[in-house]
């Protein structure tokens, strides 16, 4: 972050991405001159234009101001014409995490990390803090209804953000509070092994400012090991979980968990205090996420009861088991799940919500490397659905791998269908949903665009 000026000029390549757009919005809110580009126009670009940010559809060296610091994510390749031109001119290029750290200058930074659960936990924490009067600044990878965006510049001194472990960029932060929802191995194309993945989280914990606190889920073996090592190094640590599912009794015990289609309840006991969670979101995993947010608020100095009251108003974030529409008694949901554990959690939530109705999934695998590594586990997780349609792999930043495609999943899951074309996948998936059933479009890529097709097929009665 050295040498970056909050009032400077910044050009974001790939500004339409969830992580990039929120940072661009926050920097602009703090007085920076911001521009950006993305491959194609989108509602995100239109929203940024409405905020006064100059954005372009398509990449062209002419879009890059000569005096701008160029901001990129790991997804941007060196061959990108704007990036190549900026490097050729000797312009400074920084990662989005460095720009985010700049946007948080002067605030108490709360970094929420973990292979899954980051967006929901960050959103929960932000909503609860706002309800408690803290008015935090926020950088979340999904739209939070209370803020109308994934970005918010608050009047308070707290900054809540997702801390991305996928490329190690969370090491650019110096948090006052860290939340680690889990350390379940992912991104093994980068890290290579569980040990290396856990090591980068240990390094993340060492980035806490003096007097900072680590909040970690004791139900997850990796996060539990992280907490133990942090304690050994003298770091203030708060663990949480359901005692019967933890190797050691957690500091904050979650009891009396109940989840129904309309929400979840639980009791949390910590440090002689108790709070009752009454959540408007279903799923036991959301009880864990809410407890993490509750304790992060406590680490910032807020009381458990006021944090619990704020959590009751959280209704979800975009693409996290988000209801997108209904036709008759059939309902459509959309979920960002792209790791087997996330898929399993989403389908447990789906079963609660669907009740006696059926559950159909249209799943888009994300990354060839993840598909290769987790194909069998994806098949196992998806087996919880009644019907499964799998589209082609969404490549994102990767090139295709020989022998790696979606049939690695469907061949391990009898009765599932591989349908490469997303429109066709939507038609087939829609036709598998009976009255009272639900369909979930699932994945971290472009799969959400199938939703409109599903609803249209239902409306027209064209699903076969």
Please report, for each region that a protein language model flagged, where it lies by residue.
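N-terminal leader/targeting and accessory segments in enzymes
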Residues: 1-99, 213, 221, 282
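Short internal beta-strands
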Residues: 32-39, 213-218, 360-364, 384-395
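Short glycine-dipeptide loop
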Residues: 208-214, 355-357, 435-436
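Conserved hydrophobic helix-helix packing surfaces used for dimerization/oligomerization
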Residues: 10-12, 70, 110, 158, ...
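Beta-strand->loop->alpha-helix junctions that form or flank phosphate-binding loops
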Residues: 37-38, 56-59, 94-101, 138-142, ...
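Phosphate-binding loop of NTP-binding sites
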Residues: 26-29, 49, 63, 74-218, ...
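Nucleotide phosphate-binding/pyrophosphate-handling subdomain across enzymes
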Residues: 2-11, 19, 23-30, 171, ...
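C-terminal helical cap/extension that packs against the catalytic core
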Residues: 378-435
